[in-house]
């Protein structure tokens, strides 16, 4: 437990020479607004916003290069509040700095329809770079932002001296004890060191208090030493009021261009609340009227007034608007000089900012003849990437140590990273395109989000579908933000085979389809895979993340597949003898490797004079977004005899087959065997589909 003497020492102010009384008043105003806002809401997190007031003020008013009038400015520094529970740390700065929030928004904290929700939300509040709240995600995504910054520099201004390009900027992060405890930050921080991300500066709010109180009960490591071991540049600043130490640490971090920087800032949560300071009660609850009043007295505020902001304080802090405009104008001159020097790269930037694809980008997409050699859809995906890679320099990505299995490597490109990490297999270049995430699936998901949020490139990452479980928090957050991340998930069923049930996805398709706004795309063959990539890349901006689900095993190249049908999510692959004058007797709906089973079953049923429609349904989400007229044309409401076939749990198919339909599925874990044996033993055969069809017809 921190002693009273330590608290006294850690709360002694140290201000730079140009710090004024107005600056101190602004910092105290931040503290009072935090207590008032949480008190009015009845819940929230006041303590961190109080103790981090000097840091937040120093960053927003004295450090960050940003423009309140243009929060999408290409040259801005990025700020990530990984400690999203302390949303007031960010909201109050957005108010003081003139980014669009007003005092009434602070008063409306955590209420219906407000622009100040409990945790910061991307697009919901101007000036928020990323949705945070699930701890660890922000720091991990900031690693992606730093990687994106370097890659984009390579696209647009690779020959500029360090710090001399209009594309050079910093990524600042505030992380909490909780962030540090989350595993995703360990994964991402390790990779950040490998990548030598000198543009990433992380402030660790080391207050040693969480909801359950003193973190001694859960966190006893030397965190600074851990980050030194990763290979970060590490500094320790004693005291949250130590603005001199904070600014010196920032200057030192900027000078350490060969590695990311970690600044451990020892703060006292809830300062200067008289009785709840340095307690868990200051972390996640309103302080109470008496404590708020006492805090105001300590700071020289009228305890009977709420949300009090001196006119000279807001005038002073809104000076950031003019300073930001001036910084933007200086940058604009550098940018225009660059544009004159680099017209071709400027044209590329314009295309990417307009979110357009170049003419003919898909002209070389591979096409496979029906009944040609069978091919795994993961292999087809790899062929697609290598075909479109030369035309889409904005597309980059890799795998969580499964590149050869996921087929995620674009042919003939370097790996992304400092040349010193090159191996016999891979040549690394600062601006390479192939990403090596290592066995860090969770970090990969968050890093992909950071890359896409930073903009304007497109990033993808691959692993086995079973390991999407490790990525789920990042995938959900990407879906919440509606950002265009691409996940390549291969080895998509018991068809994985001999590795056995630990690696065989069973419930994963249903679990992923349960995530709102995530599109789960499972193509039936090589051509549907190419069509899926075309659709994914051609969709409009902010269409949400996509999971591309691919087979390990080879599958036939089918007749009748088409790009428009894939783009619509589901379509009639074959009608088995029916015509407009005759509806099918039964509809077989299938995805992925099971479409071939439906096609084979259709032929067997035709021998029995049963008219069968086969519907390929690569993406349920895309299909359900189509007009009713189209959906009814594919699945006529008058045909209630329906069978769905998918090598996963049946959970999501009931709504399409109805109460009278049947689902050929797997409701248990698999075993270690070759995929042919598993499919046969688990009933994924044409004969099993025929039996299901006959049963629904009998009913």
UniProtKB/Swiss-Prot annotation:
Keywords: Calcium, Magnesium, Metal-binding, Thiamine pyrophosphate, Transferase. InterPro entries: THDP-binding, Transketo_C/PFOR_II, Transketolase-like_C_2, Transketolase-like_Pyr-bd, Transketolase_bac-like, Transketolase_BS, Transketolase_CS, Transketolase_fam. One of its GO terms (biological process) is pentose-phosphate shunt. PROSITE patterns: TRANSKETOLASE_1, TRANSKETOLASE_2. Substrate binds at residues 45, 283, 378, 405, 491, 499, 552. One of its GO terms (cellular component) is cytosol. CDD domains: TPP_PYR_DXS_TK_like, TPP_TK. Its cofactor is Mg(2+); Ca(2+); Mn(2+); Co(2+). Its EC number is 2.2.1.1. The keyword Cell membrane does not apply. It comes from the Bacteria. Pfam families: Transket_pyr (PF02779), Transketolase_C_1 (PF22613), Transketolase_N (PF00456). It catalyses: D-sedoheptulose 7-phosphate + D-glyceraldehyde 3-phosphate = aldehydo-D-ribose 5-phosphate + D-xylulose 5-phosphate. The record marks 45, 283 as: Important for catalytic activity. This is Transketolase. It comes from Mycobacterium leprae (strain TN). The lineage of its organism: Bacteria, Bacillati, Actinomycetota, Actinomycetes, Mycobacteriales.
């Amino acid at each position: 437990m921190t002693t009273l003497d330590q608290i006294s020492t850690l709360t002694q102010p140290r201000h730079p020479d140009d710090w004024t009384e107005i600056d101190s008043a602004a910092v105290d105003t931040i503290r009072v607004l935090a207590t008032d806002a949480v008190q009015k809401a009845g819940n929230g997190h006041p303590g961190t916003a109080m103790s981090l007031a000097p840091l937040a003020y120093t960053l927003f008013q004295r450090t960050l290069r940003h423009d309140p009038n243009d929060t999408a400015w290409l040259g801005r520094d990025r700020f990530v509040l990984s400690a999203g529970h302390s949303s007031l740390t960010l909201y109050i700065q957005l108010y003081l700095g003139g980014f669009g929030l007003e005092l009434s928004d602070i008063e409306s904290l955590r209420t219906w329809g407000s622009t100040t929700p409990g945790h910061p939300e991307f697009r919901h509040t101007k000036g928020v770079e990323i949705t945070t709240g699930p701890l660890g995600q922000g720091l991990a995504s900031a690693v992606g932002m730093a990687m994106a910054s370097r890659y984009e520099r390579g696209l647009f201004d690779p020959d500029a001296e360090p710090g001399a390009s209009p594309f050079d900027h910093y990524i600042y992060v505030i992380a909490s004890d909780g962030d540090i405890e989350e595993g995703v930050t360990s994964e991402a921080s390790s990779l950040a060191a490998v990548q030598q991300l000198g543009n990433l500066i992380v402030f660790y709010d080391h207050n040693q208090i969480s909801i359950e109180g003193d973190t001694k009960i859960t966190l006893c490591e030397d965190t600074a030493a851990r980050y030194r071991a990763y290979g970060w540049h590490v500094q320790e600043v004693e005291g949250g009021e130590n603005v001199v130490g904070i600014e010196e640490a920032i200057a030192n971090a900027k000078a350490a261009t060969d590695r990311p920087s970690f600044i451990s800032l020892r703060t006292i949560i809830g300062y200067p609340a008289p009785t709840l300071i340095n307690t868990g009660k200051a972390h996640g609850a309103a302080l109470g009227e008496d404590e708020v009043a006492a805090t105001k007295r300590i700071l020289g505020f009228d305890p009977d007034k709420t949300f009090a902001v001196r006119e000279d304080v807001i005038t002073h802090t809104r000076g950031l608007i003019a300073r930001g405009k001036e910084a933007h104008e200086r940058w604009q001159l550098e940018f225009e000089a660059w544009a004159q020097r680099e017209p071709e790269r400027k044209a590329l930037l314009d295309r990417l900012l307009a979110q357009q694809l170049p003419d003919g980008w898909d002209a070389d997409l591979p096409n496979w003849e029906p009944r040609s050699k069978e091919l795994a859809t993961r292999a087809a995906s790899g062929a697609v990437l290598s075909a479109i890679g030369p035309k889409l320099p904005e597309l980059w990505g890799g795998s969580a140590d499964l590149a050869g299995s996921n087929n995620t490597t674009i042919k003939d490109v370097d790996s992304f990273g400092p040349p010193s990490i090159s191996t016999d297999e891979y040549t690394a270049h600062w601006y390479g395109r192939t990403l090596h995430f290592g066995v860090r699936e969770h970090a990969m998901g968050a890093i992909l989000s950071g890359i896409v949020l930073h903009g304007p490139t497109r990033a993808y990452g691959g692993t086995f579908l079973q390991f999407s479980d490790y990525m789920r928090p990042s995938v959900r957050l990407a879906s919440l933000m509606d950002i265009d991340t691409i996940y390549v998930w291969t080895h998509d069923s018991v068809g994985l085979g001999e590795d056995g049930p630990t690696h065989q996805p069973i419930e994963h398709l249903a679990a992923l389809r349960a995530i709102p706004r995530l599109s789960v795309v499972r193509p039936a063959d090589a051509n549907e895979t190419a069509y899926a990539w075309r659709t994914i890349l051609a969709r409009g901006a902010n269409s949400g993340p996509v999971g591309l689900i691919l087979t390990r095993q080879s599958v036939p190249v089918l007749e009748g597949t088409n790009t428009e049908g894939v783009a619509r999510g589901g379509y009639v692959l074959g009608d088995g003898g029916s015509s407009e004058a005759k509806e099918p007797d039964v509809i077989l709906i299938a995805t992925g490797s099971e479409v071939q089973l439906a096609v084979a079953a259709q032929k067997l049923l035709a021998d029995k004079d049963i008219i069968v429609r086969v519907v390929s349904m690569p993406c349920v989400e895309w299909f359900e977004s189509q007009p009713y007229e189209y959906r009814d044309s594919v699945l006529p409401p008058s045909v209630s005899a329906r069978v769905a076939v998918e090598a996963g749990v049946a959970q999501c198919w009931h709504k399409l087959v109805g109460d009278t339909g049947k689902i050929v599925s797997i409701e248990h874990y698999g075993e270690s065997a070759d995929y042919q044996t598993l499919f046969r033993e688990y009933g994924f055969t044409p004969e099993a589909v025929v039996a299901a069809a006959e049963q629904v017809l009998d009913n």
